[in-house]
């Protein structure tokens, strides 16, 4: 990880980061929160992350010179975590009967009543934040807002999620998903109104949540999630990488990286690749990640008879993750629910053409005809055609790669961290000018 120098005009701060999802969970929110904590610490700020415990019990851990307060949690069994592969189906009656996958024992951890433990840590460790940064609109986030309001601490809220990310995996709620999604959209908007400053990864995400963002009571700005451009670079993976994962070095690879869950519409991508294979039998689809939909997708691949052309690689981290991006001929996501999509940033930084869905914020990274193609949601033929155009035209792929490397320069993680430093400084100074209690408010009114 590249550590940027601290800006001379920014004072050192005590920063509380509250996230109901944090490492070792693997998704966009946890990755961003981890990057934020690491980079702010590297610039000299004191950072404490408040997140659900991975064991269920309260504890505090030191991670790369910052602390993570693990708040007492309970298992949310209807949604799997992304720290490991899915558990094997449970079998009974001597292995003759497979128990339906009604729920998964390694689900998300939820901290339902975290406020007392937040107070406890801050009191025992003499930690009073200068600013609180909320990453998700759930229990830990709301508790940190309540704590901050009580102690007159400014609050910054970043909204990373689309409603579909939360509920489209729960098939039992599928008939109600339109109503639920609208309700959640309203909830996330009202949640953000508790902030002194709100951010979202892209302008499109802001416009989806706020009809007139400029009229909101607090500033609302687009700040990219950013990625470390010193880590994700357009190099060829070493020979050892291909051998380790038994990947072909000279065949076209269609790459998909991320959560393998229903709202990512990976089944659409598989069906599109099935069409591509009718004219390009050497194409390979490589799916990196795990999630609730993997068993269904593996079954779909088997039924289509394309198991030799589709590889499920499971969750990959570190340099292996970077090399999977580098090994791709083209990166493709059929997901219509991205607020930005860190994987699009990573792929573009590795010099890969990208294909996405023309919905929401993806178009800021995947620019149609510039560094890739945008397709209609679940349009299998259009996605297949877009993949084939890139696989069949090396010059087009090279042009898209070059253009993508220019686009990605705007999303350097250093710029993102500097922007949040400025935002923190702004809300801290603004909070100092506000009356602390009703007596100060009354006094100021009387002086007018």
Model feature map: region roles:
Residues 9-72, 414, 421, 425, ...:
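N-terminal subdomain of nucleotide-sugar transferases
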Residues 53, 204, 226:
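Carbohydrate-associated surface elements
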Residues 192, 315-316, 323-328:
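Short alpha-helical donor nucleotide-sugar binding micro-motif in glycosyltransferases
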Residues 199, 248-264, 270-273:
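Conserved donor-binding/catalytic core segment of Leloir-type glycosyltransferases
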Residues 296-316:
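Nucleotide-activated donor-binding/catalytic signature segment of Leloir-type glycosyltransferases, i.e.
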Residues 336:
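Aromatic "clamp/platform" in nucleotide-sugar-dependent glycosyltransferases that forms part
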Residues 353-356, 366:
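Short hydrophobic beta-strand element within catalytic cores of glycosyltransferases
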Residues 368-369, 373-380, 389-395, 409:
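Conserved acidic donor-binding segment of nucleotide-sugar-dependent glycosyltransferases
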């Amino acid at each position: 990880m590249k550590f940027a120098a601290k800006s001379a005009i920014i004072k050192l701060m005590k920063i509380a980061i509250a996230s109901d999802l944090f490492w070792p969970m693997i998704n966009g929110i946890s990755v961003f929160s981890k990057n934020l904590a690491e980079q702010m610490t590297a610039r000299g700020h004191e950072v404490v992350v408040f997140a659900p415990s991975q064991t269920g019990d309260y504890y505090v851990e030191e991670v790369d010179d910052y602390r993570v307060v693990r708040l007492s949690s309970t298992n949310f069994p209807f949604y799997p975590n992304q720290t490991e592969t899915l558990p094997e189906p449970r079998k009974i009656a001597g292995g003759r009967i497979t128990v339906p996958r009604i729920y998964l024992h390694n689900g998300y951890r939820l901290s339902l009543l975290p406020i007392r433990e937040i107070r406890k840590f801050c009191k025992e460790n003499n930690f009073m934040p200068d600013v609180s940064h909320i990453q998700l609109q759930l229990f830990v986030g709301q508790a940190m807002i309540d704590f901050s309001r009580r102690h007159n601490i400014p609050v910054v809220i970043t909204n990373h999620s689309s409603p579909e990310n939360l509920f489209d995996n729960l098939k039992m709620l599928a008939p109600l998903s339109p109503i639920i999604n609208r309700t959640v959209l309203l909830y996330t908007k009202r949640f953000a109104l508790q902030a002194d400053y709100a951010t979202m990864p892209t302008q499109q995400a802001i416009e989806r949540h706020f009809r007139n963002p400029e009229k909101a009571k607090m500033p609302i700005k687009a700040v990219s999630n950013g990625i470390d451009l010193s880590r994700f670079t357009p190099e060829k993976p070493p020979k050892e990488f291909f051998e380790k994962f038994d990947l072909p070095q000279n065949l076209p690879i269609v790459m998909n990286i991320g959560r393998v869950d229903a709202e990512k519409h990976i089944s659409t991508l598989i069906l599109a690749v099935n069409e591509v294979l009718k004219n390009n039998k050497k194409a390979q689809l490589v799916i990196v990640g795990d999630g609730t939909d993997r068993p269904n997708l593996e079954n779909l691949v088997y039924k289509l008879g394309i198991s030799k052309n589709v590889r499920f690689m499971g969750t990959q981290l570190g340099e292996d993750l970077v090399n999977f991006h580098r090994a791709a001929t083209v990166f493709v996501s059929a997901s219509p629910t991205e607020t930005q999509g860190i994987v699009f940033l990573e792929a573009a930084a590795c010099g890969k053409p990208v294909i996405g869905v023309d919905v929401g914020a993806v178009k800021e990274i995947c620019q149609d005809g510039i560094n890739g193609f945008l397709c209609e949601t679940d349009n299998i033929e259009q996605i297949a055609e877009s993949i084939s155009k890139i696989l069949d035209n090396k010059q087009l792929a090279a042009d898209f790669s070059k253009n993508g490397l220019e686009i990605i320069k705007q999303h350097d993680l250093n710029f993102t961290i500097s922007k949040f430093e400025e935002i923190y400084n702004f809300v801290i100074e603004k909070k100092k000018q506000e009356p602390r209690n009703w007596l100060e408010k009354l006094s100021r009114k009387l002086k007018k």
